[in-house]
């Protein structure tokens, strides 16, 4: 029931990764990267499909060898989500996966080879209408830039990025996006701010090597949140030392928190105190797991008492306010029913699913009327 965020997004050019539009006002795409051995086709396909199920718009796959390139061909045939091939050092691998229908090439022109090899990759990408992502990382800056700046700085990352951008410009290739990642939040944020002023191409956001599930999510929320709130960013990845599925969930949670893009349920829940009339924490944890399949955008407030419960329920799609033995259920801000506190999880799940179906049907009818 909340309005969209009052964020003015940076204007950028439009590219396509497969069928996913990037930039020029398109929805911010959420992506992750597989962490299986790419040569293990079955495991990689299963992981990609798991990422698809939680809403991944794009998935990146590392392709370090020719054997991995051959595996990529088989993987590509079995999934629907657009795939980005992560290529380093060997330009021939980029040419090979281009033959196999890759949707985007992630390369670092600084380590892909000499001028002629870069030109071959770019010409191939142009011929097959494949976009490129230039990936600059604070941990792998060119040696001369390390010597010039002494350490990774925003100016160093910007210079590295512009060096590669200029390279593609000289080859008359403009179908690319750029990232300037660092594990330090402020280094990454300032680097993206500088880059956003220099180019019109889409920007892929990320705090690289952010950390484990908890610390990495916090770092990413701060860094990406700062940039997104300033209108910077067209795609994003939350890099976690965890199951890649968690990266997608956190990515959407960041976008939901900023009211930029919603997918699924936005749970609003109190941290609990002695006033709670039912098990709020257990209810929220159970419902988050049970309702992962719901992609309908809706706010659900679960508050354990009447102090803040009614107020939150007024601005939620569905809201529960804790009461003695039974708790009040609100729908679109209006009190509708009372739920038994001892059977809260099952009752609330049923109500949420019913509301999601109702909203989906209403949107389907709206679309049909517009199409007429």
Curated annotation (Swiss-Prot):
Entry's Gene Ontology molecular function annotations: 4 iron, 4 sulfur cluster binding; 4-hydroxy-3-methylbut-2-en-1-yl diphosphate synthase activity (ferredoxin); 4-hydroxy-3-methylbut-2-enyl-diphosphate synthase activity (flavodoxin); iron ion binding
A Pfam family hit: GcpE
Source organism, top-level taxon: Bacteria
Cofactor(s) in the UniProt record: [4Fe-4S] cluster
Cofactor binding note of this UniProt entry: Binds 1 [4Fe-4S] cluster.
Keywords, sorted A to Z: 4Fe-4S, Iron, Iron-sulfur, Isoprene biosynthesis, Metal-binding, Oxidoreductase
InterPro entries from the UniProt entry: Dihydropteroate_synth-like_sf (IPR011005), IspG_bac (IPR016425), IspG_bac-typ (IPR004588), NO2/SO3_Rdtase_4Fe4S_sf (IPR045854)
Catalytic activity: (2E)-4-hydroxy-3-methylbut-2-enyl diphosphate + oxidized [flavodoxin] + H2O + 2 H(+) = 2-C-methyl-D-erythritol 2,4-cyclic diphosphate + reduced [flavodoxin]
Signal peptide range: none
EC number assigned by the record: 1.17.7.3
Binding site for [4Fe-4S] cluster: 270, 273, 305, 312
Pathway(s) where this gene product acts: Isoprenoid biosynthesis; isopentenyl diphosphate biosynthesis via DXP pathway; isopentenyl diphosphate from 1-deoxy-D-xylulose 5-phosphate: step 5/6
GO biological process: isopentenyl diphosphate biosynthetic process, methylerythritol 4-phosphate pathway; terpenoid biosynthetic process
UniProt keyword DNA-binding present: no
Gene3D superfamilies (alphabetical): Dihydropteroate synthase-like (3.20.20.20), Sulfite Reductase Hemoprotein, domain 1 (3.30.413.10)
PANTHER family hit by this protein: 4-HYDROXY-3-METHYLBUT-2-EN-1-YL DIPHOSPHATE SYNTHASE (PTHR30454), 4-HYDROXY-3-METHYLBUT-2-EN-1-YL DIPHOSPHATE SYNTHASE (FERREDOXIN), CHLOROPLASTIC (PTHR30454:SF0)
Family under the similarity heading: Belongs to the IspG family.
Chain's role: Converts 2C-methyl-D-erythritol 2,4-cyclodiphosphate (ME-2,4cPP) into 1-hydroxy-2-methyl-2-(E)-butenyl 4-diphosphate.
Protein name listed in UniProt: 4-hydroxy-3-methylbut-2-en-1-yl diphosphate synthase (flavodoxin)
Species of the source: Escherichia coli O8 (strain IAI1)
């Amino acid at each position: 029931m909340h309005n969209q965020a009052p964020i003015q997004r940076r204007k950028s050019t439009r590219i396509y990764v497969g069928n996913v539009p990037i930039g020029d006002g398109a929805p911010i795409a959420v992506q992750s990267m597989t962490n299986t051995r790419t040569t293990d086709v079955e495991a990689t396909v299963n992981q990609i499909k798991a990422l698809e199920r939680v809403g991944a718009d794009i998935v990146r796959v590392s392709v370090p060898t020719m054997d991995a390139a051959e595996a990529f061909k088989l993987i590509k045939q079995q999934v629907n989500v657009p795939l980005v091939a992560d290529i380093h050092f060997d330009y021939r691998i980029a040419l090979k996966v281009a033959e196999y229908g890759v949707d985007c090439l992630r390369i670092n022109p600084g380590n892909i080879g000499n001028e002629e090899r870069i030109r071959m990759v770019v010409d191939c990408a142009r011929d097959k209408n494949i976009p490129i992502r230039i990936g600059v990382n604070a941990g792998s800056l060119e040696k001369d830039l390390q010597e010039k700046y002494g350490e990774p700085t925003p100016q160093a990352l910007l210079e590295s990025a512009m060096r590669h951008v200029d390279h593609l410009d000289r080859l008359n290739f403009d179908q690319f996006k750029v990232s300037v990642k660092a594990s330090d939040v402020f280094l990454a944020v300032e680097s993206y701010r500088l880059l956003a002023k220099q180019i019109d191409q889409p920007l892929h956001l990320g705090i690289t090597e952010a950390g484990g599930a908890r610390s990495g999510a916090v770092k990413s929320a701060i860094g990406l949140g700062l940039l997104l709130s300033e209108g910077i960013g067209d795609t994003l990845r939350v890099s976690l030392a965890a199951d890649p599925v968690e990266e997608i969930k956190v990515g959407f949670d960041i976008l939901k928190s900023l009211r930029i893009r919603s997918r699924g349920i936005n749970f609003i829940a109190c941290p609990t105190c002695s006033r709670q009339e039912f098990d709020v924490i257990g209810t929220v944890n159970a419902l988050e797991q049970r309702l992962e399949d719901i992609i309908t955008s809706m706010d659900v407030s679960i508050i354990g008492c009447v102090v803040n419960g009614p107020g939150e329920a007024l601005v939620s799609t569905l809201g529960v306010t804790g009461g003695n033995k039974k708790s009040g259920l609100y729908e679109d801000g209006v009190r509708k029913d009372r739920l038994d506190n001892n059977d809260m999880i099952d009752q609330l799940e049923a109500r949420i699913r019913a509301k999601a179906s109702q909203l989906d049907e209403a949107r389907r009818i709206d679309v049909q009327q517009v199409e007429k």
